[in-house]
Amino acid sequence: MNFTSKRALLITPFYMLFEFFLLKYIFLLVGGIDEAYILILTLFIGLIHFMPLIFESKKSRGITRFLTVIDGIWMWASLMFLMDIVFIYIVARFISLPFEVILILLMIVPVLGIYNYWKGHNLVVHEKTIELANLEKDISIAHLSDIHFGSLRHRKIIRDIADRLNGIDCDLAIISGDLADGTSVVEPDDFMAFRNVGMPVVFTPGNHDFYMGIDDVIAACRKAGIIVLDNQSMEFGCLNIHGIIFSFDDKGKPELDESLIKRDLTNVLIYHVPYCWEEFSEMGFDVQLSGHTHGGQFYPAVWFGNLIFKYNKGLFKNDLGRYLHVTTGVGATATPMRWGTDSEIVVLRLKRF
């Protein structure tokens, strides 16, 4: 049994317990319902949550992907309903809320859901400028991360990205991890749309790329013409690009040989997590490209993301004149929703000054 299935098997009973009490309180607010019906609903929700993960680990199918999307939307809605209920009960301690007001407050969730779903699927292109003194000539990088190809977003997201990249004036595209989500198997032809991209595409794996098998991800990448940097370096024009593969064994800063730095080139580091920037910068890397955080993906997780990660999203510059860019990613994990963050491709214009 793979990592994703094991995690689902462990979490599903607790998730169902949460859903039972959530549904119970929602129905209490609107008049109540027999607990037997709530139990049936809970079992149904549990099946929708767990069964697609089992089938998708063998072969991805349209019906199981559809159920995964429904489950993801409902997980998001459950969190929103929970906050709604807490708010209603707090206010109700001080004033009596009419039934119509309670109903309106509950209806905010599906209205927000429409916006969140659209936001999660509306791929936008941002542009940022990086000024470097040691840059031989201007060059542009399309930075992507966290595509999360899997049960929530399948081949269409790859086609959409490829089409968008072909409409961007860039020299190179870099994917800083989590090309795959780990919720479905990756088949050899899944990334073939990237073969039609009119620029080199470079990829260094992140944590999710391992969940269903990193070998399948790398094989599909290579078939699609994607350059995989697995603790390897490459030169591209005036750039020396090094990719550090995500390791579950890393404790603190990954070991790097300073000989990887090429003083006559601009040194770019691809590292999925936005960690150790200070150390890598002092070592000589001019630009670090990271993802992983999703910027929190949606409220209220965005607030917690800012607390958990020192560098949650955006472009950062230190006193050495070196940069860290943390993108909020293209895809989504667990739920196909976004609120307060963009599904983005970021064009980084590296300019000499």
Give the residues covered by each predicted segment.
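Soluble catalytic domains of enzymes that build or remodel membrane lipids, polysaccharides, and related
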Residues: 131-353
